[in-house]
């Protein structure tokens, strides 16, 4: 890589489904899914803490007909991730589950049920088609970002895509028995070096790979390193991105037998960069897991990705960052902007016009367009919320219309 006249490094990390923070996310989203399965309009905001021998679930819920067995849901989630033995220090059967869930604040509920705009409308105005999605207000204030880039087929930044691939591969090899000594907790980090910005670089390589994986007590670090180099890295990292200068740090701290909630306390919402774009772009600060789609922290971040991805898929830019901001209790965003980093085939101002014409970022409209009141969230909890075709916000169904409108 020394031949590069300019060297720019881009690093992203991923953590496995058994990482304590990700386990907390998975529990929270499993509870959310069960409420939505029983009652799609449930309001849910659930946080989870996991530590040695204990899980604590707290939050606010509003549901009229749903009756969720929280204890059962938590234990089933822990079982699915792989904490099945008491000697892990945390397991599905014997760990305690403490529940402190109460009803959603009626003041917040009122502002979400009927937005400020809706309350100010006459009955005649409420019947107009353009106001159909104005009834529901945003569940909180805040700013959310969505991003897309043409550096990978899934229109995601390369470093985070590679890092997620490594942790997903570790889970596959653990679950299929190929590497039986692997345990649920793991992390991976990938540093990519380029001779310029992602959209202008002509040379790209992987500079550094870091893998830290929990393991049984009876395996050597030499064996782990050999298996990572044989079974994990080649299955994920394209050979053309590796060279003789690529560095590999495999369990650089040494033994990693004590892991998961027994090694570190986990909390919902602590891996927001892992969940999104790996640090490639700004983050508004709001976490996703455990929140129903009236919470714009989640739904608007998904929608911003949807908008950005369609812009890039339409060929209107090589990179697109979309920012949406809200006021609590109001339906319409207070602001929406796009930044294409100078890669647009039309101006950012033109893209603003196209977004206004082809997208609707009111919370109720987002929920309807992406069909978000479904039990689809537990599967988002690990390996990133973006770049995965199974999710509705990854559709590029508006790209052609955007392209045609831009040419018109």
UniProtKB/Swiss-Prot annotation:
Subcellular location field: Cytoplasm
Residues annotated for ATP binding in this entry: 19, 185-187, 255-256, 264, 270-271, 287, 291
Domain of life (superkingdom): Bacteria
Co-factor note (free text): Binds 2 divalent ions per subunit. Binds 1 potassium ion per subunit.
GO cellular component term of the entry, any: cytosol
Binding site for Mg(2+): 21
Binding positions for L-methionine per the UniProt entry: 60, 104, 264, 295
Protein name per its UniProtKB record: S-adenosylmethionine synthase
């Amino acid at each position: 890589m020394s031949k590069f006249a300019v060297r720019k490094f881009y690093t992203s990390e991923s953590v496995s489904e058994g990482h304590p923070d990700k386990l907390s996310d998975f529990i929270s989203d499993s509870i959310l899914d069960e409420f939505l399965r029983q009652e799609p309009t449930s309001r849910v905001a659930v946080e989870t803490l996991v530590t040695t021998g204990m899980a604590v679930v707290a939050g606010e819920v509003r549901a009229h007909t749903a009756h969720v067995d929280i204890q059962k849901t938590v234990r089933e989630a822990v079982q699915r991730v792989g904490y099945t033995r008491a000697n892990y220090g945390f397991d599905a059967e014997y760990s305690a589950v403490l529940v402190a869930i109460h009803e959603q604040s009626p003041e917040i509920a009122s502002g979400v049920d009927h937005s400020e705009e809706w309350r100010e409308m006459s009955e005649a105005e409420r019947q107009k088609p353009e106001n159909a999605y104005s009834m529901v207000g945003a569940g909180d204030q805040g700013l959310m970002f969505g991003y897309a880039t043409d550096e990978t087929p899934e229109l995601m930044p390369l470093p985070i895509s590679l890092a997620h691939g490594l942790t997903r591969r570790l889970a596959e090899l653990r679950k299929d028995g190929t590497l039986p000594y692997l345990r649920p907790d793991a992390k991976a980090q990938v540093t990519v070096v380029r001779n310029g910005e992602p959209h202008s670089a002509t040379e790209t390589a992987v500079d550094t790979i870091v893998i830290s994986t929990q393991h049984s007590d009876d395996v050597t670090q030499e064996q782990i390193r050999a298996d990572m180099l044989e079974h994990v890295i080649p299955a994920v990292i394209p050979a053309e991105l590796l060279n003789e200068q690529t560095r590999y740090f495999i369990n650089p701290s040494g033994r990693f037998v004590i892991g998961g909630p027994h090694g570190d306390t986990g909390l919902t919402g602590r891996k927001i960069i892992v969940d999104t774009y790996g640090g490639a772009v700004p983050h508004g600060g709001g976490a996703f897991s455990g929140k129903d789609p009236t919470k714009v922290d989640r739904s608007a971040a998904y929608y911003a990705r949807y908008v950005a991805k369609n812009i890039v898929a339409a060929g209107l830019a090589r990179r697109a960052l979309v920012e949406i901001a809200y006021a609590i209790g109001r339906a319409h965003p207070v602001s929406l902007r796009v930044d294409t980093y100078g890669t647009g085939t039309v101006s950012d101002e033109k893209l603003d016009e196209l977004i206004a014409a082809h997208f609707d970022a009111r919370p109720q409209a987002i929920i309807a367009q992406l069909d978000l009141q479904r039990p689809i969230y537990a599967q988002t909890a690990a390996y990133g919320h973006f770049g995965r075709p199974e999710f509705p916000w990854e559709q590029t169904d508006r790209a052609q219309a955007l392209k045609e409108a831009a040419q018109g």
